[in-house]
Amino acid sequence: MLESERPERDMEEEGEESNEEEEEEGMSFSDPEGFEDDISDEELLGDILKDRPQEADGIDSVIVVDNVPQVGPDRLEKLKNVIVKIFSKFGKLTNEFYPQAEGSTKGYIFLEYALPAQAQDAVKNADGYKLDKQHTFRVNLFTDFDKYMVIGDEWDVPEKQPFKDFGNLRSWLEDPDCRDQFSVIYESGDRTSIFWTDVKEPVPVEERARWTETYVRWSPKGTYLATFHQRGIALWGGEKFKQIQRFSHQGVQLIDFSPCERYLVTFSPLMDTKEEPQAIIIWDILTGHNKRGFHCESSAHWPIFKWSHDGKFFARMTLDTLSIYETPSMGLLDKKSLKITGIKDFSWSPGGNIIAFWVPEDKDIPARVTLMQMPTRQEIRVRNLFNVVDCKLHWQKNGDYLCVKVDRTPKGTQGMVTNFEIFRMREKQVPVDVVEMKDGIIAFAWEPNGSKFAVLHGEVPRISVSFYHVKNNGKIELIKMYDKQQANTIFWSPQGQFLVLAGLRSMNGALAFVDTSDCTIMNIAEHYTASDVEWDPTGRYVITSVSWWSHKVDNAYWMWTFQGRLLQKNNKDRFCQLLWRPRPPSLLSQDQIKQIKKDLKKYSKIFEQKDRLSQTKASKELIERRRAMMEEYKTYREMATKLYMEQKTARLEIRGGVDTDLLDSNVEDWEEETIEFFVTEEIIPVEE
């Protein structure tokens, strides 16, 4: 029985196999005869083909270097070593080609990098590299030659742009009363106003809502007012404060002007990328063009770039490097940075292209302060220092003196002492004098246009202020010292001689007004919780203020004379910031200024007469203003009465014919009251 079943099973299995073969033939995935595939290689092999060599890959990585020395075979190897040393800094060199003719090189070479980005970096940084007195490299991408060869012969004349007349950008200097302007931000930043200063009350010039999103800043000479916006910076100026220029820099937070007002530096933490540095941008103010972008290190302090006094150079410090750039090219001076191991800080002289920097101690090598002349990079003075903890550089406004505040720990002692190293910059070989103080230093400040400096030292509550004078023979004399001062900041008048000792914030706004000609305290006052002190550019007035940004109540600014007499108290809702508008340097020579000071008594009589006339003028202006207000009220009253009478018919219809005007009038209950006020006038006899 089992044997009889076997054939049947075999037949069944064979039948199943034949069915499977038939199904496989019906489901065949083979292409029919004559089939043409319309799928491209890019669709099938896109991930592989994207890495295939491109025709332009090699060309994009090739640079051409001109003005290379022409040498023979005996010096070719040496030339190659020099070229590799210079250009390998920008990336890996894969090929070099030195064309030759008649036994020497032709003066230009071809270099190929591993990546196009490396070639672009070489062009950017090596173009203009000075090899020696006779050879300055000109570096271009090889692809640039094709680009410039296909330029057509036809030239399209650019459209002439209309001239934008912004008016007189220094119109505020022509004020007949020689007043100064200042900006005020209040209502927690929603409103910004510009005022003329006046003894009685500020005179408004311009007021706008949401003029800036954070704060404002004046340019160094007062020409422009900068406002901050999420999309960038706007500059305003002229009599009506029209928009002069705008710079698009998303998320900008900080700015800085060059001293010459030609360039603007902006910083945004949002824009930086590895491919295109945009964290810091330097702009040309006149054209609005982006001159150059830079990366920003996370540990940097603003301003990252520091400008020379004339705006010709700017510099930045990175690890063991001081990079100095020149304008208008925005390239590195001499195409290379200064390698200064351990450099901690640097500062430009306000009176010349001299840069000061200091380096801390390193094992047995002492700390040193170096003065270097630019652009020659000549060291004009080096000062070695020992046991140094920290140094601070303080320049006098004219660059006549440099004070290096040196904190050090003498051997064998646990405490710290401070030396003031005074460099006399205008004398041969730059002699240095030293003042030593054992107290802790709170503040130091030079007299702007003189040879005195003030120091706050000690600890609360025994804080002292000392005044020193640098004599012509180099001797530093202590003029005066006051004990028990409530101050943590020194504010010199821009013209010198007078200063304010202020105890800001935690010291509750204590103020001392000092005349340093004889070191007398002219007045002691207080502006409770004051956060800021601002001198006007002429040194006539001082403003103290309580900013809403630091203290949420009692927000106001007070105006004082330089002698400490309070003139005004101006309360502004959520007052934030006040800044005086700077003035450009005087056009008068020093001899002319001395002559004016000599004849000051003669001019003072004229000024006193003008003050009296201004008071009389103010009274007349008050009368005219009140008359104008009365006329405005009368006009409005007549218009309202006319409208009221025109609507009487409609009122009667609404109220069913009842004249409610008569019901509500109650004329018999009215009381009439007359108010009189008297305005005095001063009559000044004019002598013939």
UniProtKB/Swiss-Prot annotation:
GO terms for cellular component: cytoplasmic stress granule; eukaryotic 43S preinitiation complex; eukaryotic 48S preinitiation complex; eukaryotic translation initiation factor 3 complex. One of its GO terms (biological process) is regulation of translational initiation. WD repeats lie at residues 164-206, 208-246, 248-293, 297-335, 338-373, 436-492, 525-570, 635-680. Residues 10-26, 33-43 have a biased composition (Acidic residues). Residues 61-144 form the RRM domain. The keyword Protein biosynthesis applies. GO terms for molecular function: RNA binding; translation initiation factor activity; translation initiation factor binding. It is found in: Cytoplasm; Cytoplasm, Stress granule. It holds the Pfam family RRM_1. It comes from the Eukaryota. The keyword Iron-sulfur does not apply. Residues 589-640 form a coiled coil. Keywords: Coiled coil, Cytoplasm, Initiation factor, Protein biosynthesis, Repeat, RNA-binding, WD repeat. Belongs to the eIF-3 subunit B family. Component of the eukaryotic translation initiation factor 3 (eIF-3) complex, which is composed of 13 subunits: eif3a, eif3b, eif3c, eif3d, eif3e, eif3f, eif3g, eif3h, eif3i, eif3j, eif3k, eif3l and eif3m. This is Eukaryotic translation initiation factor 3 subunit B. The lineage of its organism: Eukaryota, Metazoa, Chordata, Craniata, Vertebrata.
